[in-house]
């Protein structure tokens, strides 16, 4: 007896209907897969948002943003005076010292942009570190930037980038890593180096006809400018960080101590040892020592 054959569709249309009812509907499955995958996106995004909202992540984002902002500001400051010097709108000697003053003040004033995290000082230290790399790169001749050389050097030689300017940013790096914004020692030392030493040269070159008897490269008026500007900038920056709550200042004692620190820094700046020890090293080191003896690690 012959085996029974399965019934066949009577027409092509019935064949298509049979296939559509018996085979899996792939077209319907694919959208479901995309919907499942898409449903996971909000969950991942929510997890990332939750992690970013934690205090540690928030501080990290703040410090990273502050680093980028301060780096861009410091670079723009130097490039602005590069352009002014290149166009001969500002004298090279004046540009060098104005950059000297403004760089230190700008960097110090930017410290409150960083968080209260213990790692914040390391983010801030990235700014002088990048400047160190930049000065080494151009000072060693790997790249050439005549505008930079003219704006921050005394004689317009690239080798000078490896002396005064490099010492300056190294001291900035040390101050931010060792002392930071909650120590009057670092604040006063940076104020004396940037403001005091900077204005001593600016005023001394313009009005310093009467020289010191023991150092003909320095003048009475330049030394007076060193003392006054260093004292005033130190007092201003201590007030600034005290107002923001980083340090406590008892002005009945602090003012007298600042006078002694400014006097010590001025005496060191006057000593004829520039050929041996650069002012950007001797002045902040002397200031750190005297400030440590007088203030300790507080501004009382």
Curated annotation (Swiss-Prot):
Superkingdom of the source species: Eukaryota
GO cellular component terms given for this protein: chloroplast; chloroplast membrane
The organelle targeting sequence, given as a residue range: 1-36
Keywords recorded for this protein, A-Z: Chloroplast, Kinase, Membrane, Plastid, Transferase, Transit peptide, Transmembrane, Transmembrane helix
Subcellular location: Plastid, Chloroplast membrane
GO biological process, one term: vitamin E biosynthetic process
Involved pathway(s): Cofactor biosynthesis; tocopherol biosynthesis
Reaction catalysed by this enzyme: phytol + CTP = phytyl phosphate + CDP + H(+)
Mode of membrane association: Multi-pass membrane protein
Predominant cellular place of this UniProt entry's protein: plastid
Entry keyword NADP: no
Enzyme category, top tier: transferase
Similarity comment: Belongs to the polyprenol kinase family.
Stated role: Involved in the activation and reutilization of phytol from chlorophyll degradation in plant metabolism, including tocopherol biosynthesis. Catalyzes the conversion of phytol to phytol monophosphate (PMP).
Protein name as it appears in the record: Probable phytol kinase, chloroplastic
Organism encoding this protein: Triticum aestivum (Wheat)
């Amino acid at each position: 007896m012959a085996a029974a054959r399965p019934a066949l569709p009577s027409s092509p249309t019935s064949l298509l209907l049979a296939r559509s009812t018996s085979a899996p509907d792939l077209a319907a499955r694919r959208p479901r897969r995309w919907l499942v995958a898409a449903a996971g996106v909000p969950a991942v995004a929510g997890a990332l948002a939750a992690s970013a909202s934690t205090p540690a992540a928030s501080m990290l984002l703040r410090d990273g943003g502050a680093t980028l902002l301060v780096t861009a500001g410091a670079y723009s400051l130097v490039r602005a005076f590069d352009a002014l010097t290149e166009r001969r709108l500002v004298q090279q000697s004046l540009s060098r010292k104005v950059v000297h003053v403004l760089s230190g003040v700008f960097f110090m004033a930017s410290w409150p942009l960083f968080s209260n995290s213990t790692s914040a000082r390391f983010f801030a230290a990235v700014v002088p570190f990048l400047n160190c790399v930049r000065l080494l790169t151009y000072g060693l001749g790997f790249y050439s930037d005549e505008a930079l050389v003219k704006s921050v050097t005394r004689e317009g030689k690239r080798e000078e980038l490896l002396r005064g300017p490099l010492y300056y940013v190294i001291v900035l790096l040390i101050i931010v890593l060792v002392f930071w914004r909650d120590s009057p020692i670092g604040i006063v030392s940076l104020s004396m180096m940037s403001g005091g030493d900077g204005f001593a040269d600016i005023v001394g070159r313009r009005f310093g006809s009467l020289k010191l008897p023991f150092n003909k490269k320095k003048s009475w008026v330049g030394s007076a400018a060193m003392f006054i500007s260093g004292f005033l900038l130190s007092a201003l920056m201590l007030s600034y960080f005290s107002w923001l709550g980083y340090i406590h200042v008892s002005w009945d004692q602090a003012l007298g101590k600042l006078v002694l620190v400014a006097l010590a820094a001025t005496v060191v700046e006057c000593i004829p040892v520039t050929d041996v020890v650069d002012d950007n090293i001797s002045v902040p080191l002397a200031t750190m020592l005297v400030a440590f003896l007088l203030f300790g690690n507080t501004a009382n």
